[in-house]
């Protein structure tokens, strides 16, 4: 391709809307263009990158025995109601775009395709002889993100590969799950990226086990906790660990003490000269279920620990049937405005005890009249602890479960693991932290969808059983931007060869120099002929502008037909190292073929 014929515009300044390096560079280098909030156009250079990523993904999926198909983006609401996810995905903080057609039929724009594929399997799969089967597609998805940001990282329209497998047994599912794990490792490795596979929370997709594939990058939205021995890695949402040992409480006798202006853990520790590990703090949450019922949740946890909202959400979803609900729509720490809607009297915030009385809750329809009390394992172990006294300016010291306070019946693990915690598999090791960008996620779904939607098969014994499912997603457009986030410098993008839009760019410093043009044209033709995908910068621009643009767009190799032509050579510059060498014109093609491994 000739740059003079390409829709190609670069920017010298960072766009104001861009927050992270990869977003800035893709906009500046003319790869993408913002059309609206979270909506981007993929311009010619970017489309080539996306096609290459898609092809690598396609090849690895095919090699693993999956079959490509294409599913509808418009999905009937009744399918999602059948699975029980319509309310979750369209109400409160739901991410599905929903619409009503001219026949007053509700539809959703697909954020994912479990319901559609399960319906197809329900209608087409009858016998164990048809199993296992693994279907995948590469298409645009739509999600109504609350806060679209970071360009293609968190957009409202994006390209994704999603796959769904069906099985007659758990063993068969695990076999495919492992095959997908290896396929994903192959995909990301072939794209030339550093990554870490980590244990993950299954979220709204559900299932018994899941794993994320994280591209390591400082601007990553996710925190990964891992051990140096490589035996443990998990998203912080899922991570488990051993917290530091608690220090002994300085109080051995139960007593209510005046503690003025100590409504934070830090202030309380200073006032009482105690460790935060000797404190039980009580955190109030407001949970809204899909049947409209609001439950006030009181979580007791050790004072130096924080509640992991994802773990807490999972616990509350598990408890949903107790409230005649199926899932959770929203979870928040209620602010003054939210409290005013249900609090019968002012709450002693900062001084709440585990036994906060239920009469703080007004008698209102759809507000559960009693607190749901949960206690984290870290708080259960404490003796002679310090906690609130349900009165502003006062705390209880020297308290114990079973004496001053009744231990809640629901003992849970909802603490947030942190860097520096001890590893469960080897307490000598401590957890390290890294930032990551999630580009892939694989799930063992089990029978969650097939059971809800009546997708069954007949097994070898002639029994009707629900299909066992797995699902596997790769963010194609996100992976492409993650590559930039992992590999750039002050001058621009540094694409890995495998997914670069072009392998090489031939730059003509002076288009009025006939020899420069002639040699450039010859190299451009010969390189493309042997499979070295080459761009020709034949624009009527200053040489400096061309060199700057070449570095900005990140093509792996730059060939310059400049002054060295007088000695029968051209300059070859490697983008990643900026190493420059002069090579004979007749050696350029073979040299490039070896460098990019054609």
UniProtKB/Swiss-Prot annotation:
The record's EC number reads 6.1.1.15
Molecular function, one GO term: ATP binding
**SUPFAM superfamilies named among the record's database cross-references:** Class II aaRS ABD-related, Class II aaRS and biotin synthetases, YbaK/ProRS associated domain
Q: Which Gene3D superfamilies match?
A: Anticodon-binding domain (3.40.50.800), Bira Bifunctional Protein, Domain 2 (3.30.930.10)
Spell out the reaction equation it catalyses. tRNA(Pro) + L-proline + ATP = L-prolyl-tRNA(Pro) + AMP + diphosphate
Which BP terms does GO give this entry?
prolyl-tRNA aminoacylation
The family database entries (Pfam families) matched by this protein are listed as:
HGTP_anticodon, tRNA-synt_2b, tRNA_edit
InterPro entries per record: aa-tRNA-synt_IIb, aa-tRNA-synth_II, aa-tRNA-synth_II/BPL/LPL, Anticodon-bd, Anticodon-bd_dom_sf, Pro-tRNA-ligase_IIa, Pro-tRNA-synth_IIa_bac-type, Pro-tRNA-Synthase_IIa_type1
Disulfide topology: none
Is Cytoplasm given among the entry's keywords?
yes
Give its localization.
Cytoplasm
Note whether Transmembrane helix occurs among the keywords. no
- GO CC terms, sorted: cytosol
Q: Which UniProt keywords apply?
A: Aminoacyl-tRNA synthetase, ATP-binding, Cytoplasm, Ligase, Nucleotide-binding, Protein biosynthesis
What HAMAP family does UniProt report for this protein, alphabetically? Answer: Pro_tRNA_synth_type1 (MF_01569)
| Homology family | Belongs to the class-II aminoacyl-tRNA synthetase family. ProS type 1 subfamily.
Q: What does this protein do?
A: Catalyzes the attachment of proline to tRNA(Pro) in a two-step reaction: proline is first activated by ATP to form Pro-AMP and then transferred to the acceptor end of tRNA(Pro). As ProRS can inadvertently accommodate and process non-cognate amino acids such as alanine and cysteine, to avoid such errors it has two additional distinct editing activities against alanine. One activity is designated as 'pretransfer' editing and involves the tRNA(Pro)-independent hydrolysis of activated Ala-AMP.
Provide the assembly information. Answer: Homodimer.
UniProt remark on domains: Consists of three domains: the N-terminal catalytic domain, the editing domain and the C-terminal anticodon-binding domain.
Name it. Proline--tRNA ligase
Q: Which organism is it from?
A: Rippkaea orientalis (strain PCC 8801 / RF-1)
């Amino acid at each position: 391709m000739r740059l003079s014929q390409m829709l190609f515009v670069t920017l010298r300044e960072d766009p104001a809307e861009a927050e992270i390096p990869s977003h800035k560079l893709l906009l500046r280098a003319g790869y993408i263009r913002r059309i609206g909030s979270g909506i981007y156009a993929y311009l010619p250079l970017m489309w080539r990158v996306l096609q290459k990523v898609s092809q690598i993904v396609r090849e690895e999926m095919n090699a693993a025995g999956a079959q490509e198909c294409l599913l509808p983006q418009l999905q009937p609401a009744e399918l999602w109601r059948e699975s029980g996810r319509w309310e979750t995905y369209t109400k409160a903080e739901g991410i599905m775009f929903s619409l009503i057609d001219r026949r007053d039929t509700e539809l959703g724009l697909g954020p994912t395709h479990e319901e559609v594929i399960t319906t197809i399997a329900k209608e087409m799969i009858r016998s164990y002889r048809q199993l296992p089967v693994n279907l995948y597609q590469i298409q645009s998805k739509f999600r109504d993100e609350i806060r679209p940001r970071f360009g293609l990282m968190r957009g409202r329209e994006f390209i994704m590969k999603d796959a769904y497998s069906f099985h007659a047994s758990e063993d068969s599912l695990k076999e495919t799950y492992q095959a997908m794990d290896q396929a994903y490792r192959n995909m990301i490795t072939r794209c030339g990226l550093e990554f870490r596979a980590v244990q993950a929370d299954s979220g709204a997709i559900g299932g018994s086990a899941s794993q994320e594939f994280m591209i390591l990058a400082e601007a990553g939205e996710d925190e990964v906790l891992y051990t140096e021995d490589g035996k443990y890695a998990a998203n912080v949402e899922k991570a488990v660990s051993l917290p530091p040992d608690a220090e002994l409480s300085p109080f051995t006798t139960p007593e209510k003490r005046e503690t003025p202006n100590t409504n934070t853990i830090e202030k309380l520790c200073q006032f009482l000269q105690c460790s935060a590990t000797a404190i039980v703090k009580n955190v109030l949450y407001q949970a809204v279920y899909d049947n409209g019922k609001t439950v006030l949740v009181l979580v007791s946890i050790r004072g130096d620990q924080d509640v992991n909202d994802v773990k807490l959400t999972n616990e509350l979803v598990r408890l949903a049937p107790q409230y005649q609900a199926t899932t959770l729509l929203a979870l928040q720490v209620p602010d003054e405005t939210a409290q005013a809607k249900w609090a019968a009297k002012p709450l002693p915030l900062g001084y709440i005890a585990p036994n906060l009385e239920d009469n703080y809750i007004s008698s209102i329809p759809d507000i559960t009249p009693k607190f749901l009390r949960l206690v984290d394992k870290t708080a259960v172990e404490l003796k002679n602890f310090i906690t609130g006294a349900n009165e502003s300016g006062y705390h209880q010291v020297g308290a114990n479960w079973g004496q001053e306070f009744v231990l809640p019946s629901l003992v849970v693990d909802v603490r947030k693991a942190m860097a520096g915690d001890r590893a469960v598999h080897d307490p000598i090791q401590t957890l390290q932290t890294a930032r990551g960008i999630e580009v892939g996620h694989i799930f063992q779904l089990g029978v969650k969808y097939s059971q809800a939607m009546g997708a069954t098969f007949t097994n070898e014994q002639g029994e009707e059983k629900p299909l066992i499912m797995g699902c596997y997603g790769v963010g194609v457009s996100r992976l492409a931007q993650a590559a930039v986030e992992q590999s750039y410098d002050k001058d621009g993008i540094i694409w890995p060869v495998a997914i670069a839009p072009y392998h090489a760019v031939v730059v003509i410093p002076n288009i009025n120099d006939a020899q420069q043009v002639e040699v450039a044209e010859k190299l451009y033709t010969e390189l493309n002929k042997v499979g070295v995908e080459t761009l020709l910068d034949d624009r009527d621009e200053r040489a400096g502008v061309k060199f700057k643009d070449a570095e900005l767009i990140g093509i792996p190799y730059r060939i310059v037909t400049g002054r060295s032509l007088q000695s029968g050579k051209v300059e070859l510059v490697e983008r990643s190292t900026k190493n420059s060498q002069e090579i004979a014109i007749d050696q350029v093609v073979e040299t490039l073929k070896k460098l990019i491994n054609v």
